[in-house]
């Protein structure tokens, strides 16, 4: 199963700016029976992008649930498949003359900086020449990012919600 997508309305906009974006969409929150959004608020769950666009179709939801279950069944094998998908997306970007950017938390909030494949190395360190970016509601991850403890090619943006507005970063 191919885990990353490079073809949707959001990624097409980036192509006009010189970027090919590869995004991993999992079943958000606890939709698959396993929670991939540990800091999701009620408002976050209610307004989740999971059902936007093609996500409204049952086959897309089924695929997201299957990917999420595959991740929890064998995280190392899942990361290895992601590495293959990233390499394929990189070749696609090179052929098109685009720069590849990777977003692993399209509809999740997992600490990919701590998840390694068979070699135990996270994807950002395996592909140090690529840009990775994500949004997170996890303040500990943002603090680690701001302190320079995450891979240099990984950017995190704090995602505000109705119950985390009191959190400030300096």
Model regions: which residues?
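Class I S-adenosyl-L-methionine
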Residues: 1-170
């Amino acid at each position: 199963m191919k885990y990353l997508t490079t073809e949707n309305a959001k990624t097409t906009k980036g192509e006009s700016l010189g970027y090919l974006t590869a995004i991993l969409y999992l079943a958000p929150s606890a939709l698959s029976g396993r929670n991939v959004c540990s800091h999701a608020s009620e408002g976050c769950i209610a307004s989740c992008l999971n059902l936007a666009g093609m996500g409204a179709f049952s086959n897309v939801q089924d695929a997201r649930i299957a990917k999420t279950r595959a991740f929890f069944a064998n995280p190392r094998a899942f990361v290895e498949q992601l590495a293959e998908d990233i390499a394929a997306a990189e070749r696609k970007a090179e052929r098109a003359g685009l720069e590849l950017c990777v977003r692993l938390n399209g509809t999740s909030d997992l600490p990919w900086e701590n998840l390694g494949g068979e070699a135990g190395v996270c994807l950002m360190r395996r592909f140090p020449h690529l840009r990775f970016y994500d949004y997170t509601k996890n303040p500990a991850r943002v603090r680690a990012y701001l302190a320079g403890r995450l891979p240099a090619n990984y950017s995190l943006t704090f995602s505000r919600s109705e119950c985390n507005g009191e959190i400030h970063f300096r």
